[in-house]
Amino acid sequence: MQIISTSFRFWKNSRISHVWKSLKRWICLSALILSGAFFNRQDIAARRSLFMPVNRSVPDVAQKRKNWNGLISGFKASDLVFLDGSGCNTDMTRRYAYSLGGSRAVDSAPLSKPKSTTILSSIRLDGTLRYTTFSGGTTVERFKRYLETDLLPHLNGNSVLIMDDMKSHHAKAVRNLLDSSGVRYIYLPPYSPDLNPIEKLWSKVKAFLRKFKARTLNALPNAIQNAFHSVTISDCSGWFRFCGYAL
């Protein structure tokens, strides 16, 4: 800003010809500064923006996130079991595609679609994924049934179940079930998906489903199964590490 203000003072007190010459030099300098070569030399690159929830900076939330590090450090990463849900449908398609220069990348997807399919899954450091699917949203009864039949029978006294602040996760019936099972459970701080490695799982699963393009409800279960089979132990350990959990 100092350079700009100085330049304008110079232009104001100079003849038009001098101003024009100075302006051309300024334009050339700006072009040089903003050139790709300049950015490369300075190791500056265009990157996808990382958006942080505004509520995360609220003192109460910030303190809970700070306390989380101390709380989670008391457990082994191999004992952590993260649980979450996500939705998918028959209109999923790739967001990016190749095309010839001067032409648009065109794809197709159905305009009408059935009720969304919900996937509930857990993720562990060793790559163990236990999931179920159903039509519609997550109710307390559906979540409780998933815990009873798909997840809790495979946990032990060392397991630590970790959930977010979704309403069904805090239901009294769910808490009673977990208390009676003897499994330890804790909740993530609010507005903290960055602390949950299962978010990375959803990213990979949905990328697979967009590529697979299951266009009927009959084809969707097979697509989901293949998506989960594509997840490796290396993926899971990398996601745990990315979220800050010591391996």
Spans of model-derived segments:
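Major-groove recognition helix of helix-turn-helix-like DNA-binding domains
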Residues: 31-43
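C-terminal anion-handling pockets and recognition modules
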Residues: 34, 77-80, 198-247
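Acidic, metal-coordinating catalytic cores used for nucleic-acid/nucleotide bond scission
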Residues: 26-27, 89, 138, 161-174, ...
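RNase H-like two-metal-ion nuclease catalytic core shared by retroviral integrases
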Residues: 164-165, 172, 186-210, 218
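Extended, low-complexity cationic-aromatic segments
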Residues: 24, 60-148, 245
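RNase H-like polynucleotidyl transferase catalytic core
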Residues: 104-112, 181-197
